[in-house]
Regions:
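Charge-dense, helix-prone N-terminal extensions
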Residues: 1-115
Length: 115
């Protein structure tokens, strides 16, 4: 069976990153029934209606997974970092720890409320 690019993105990651990303994927997709997962820019993006809400990626320097918020610059949250990004902010995750579910839901709520 041939994997789709979006599924391959998750499958090809080593553990524990694979499990962390898969759990994050499930959490985002279960956030709202209207969430749509799409493959853009060689990464999983999640749309709510026509709005790109967030994406999943791996930090190149450390290999840590993160949740990227598309219009994160409009969100003031101490856990979100911009680094050199102009529009996006990210929430770094520790693949060896349980996902901070309440924090992720809080940030998704803030992102979904943006215009």
């Amino acid at each position: 069976m041939m994997l789709k690019d979006i599924d391959r993105f998750f499958w090809e990651k080593p553990e524990p990153v694979r499990s962390c990303l898969s759990a994050l994927r499930y959490l985002i997709k279960s956030y709202d029934p209207a969430i749509e997962e799409v493959w853009q820019y060689s990464t999983p993006f999640y749309r709510l209606g026509k709005k790109r809400l967030c994406y999943i990626w791996i930090e190149k320097k450390t290999g840590r997974p993160y949740l990227g918020i598309v219009n994160g610059k409009l969100i003031d949250h101490p856990q979100l970092i911009a680094e050199k990004r102009l529009r996006m902010k990210i929430l770094l995750l520790d693949a060896g720890e349980d996902l901070p579910v309440e924090l992720i839901m809080e940030i998704l709520n803030m992102a979904a409320a943006l215009p």
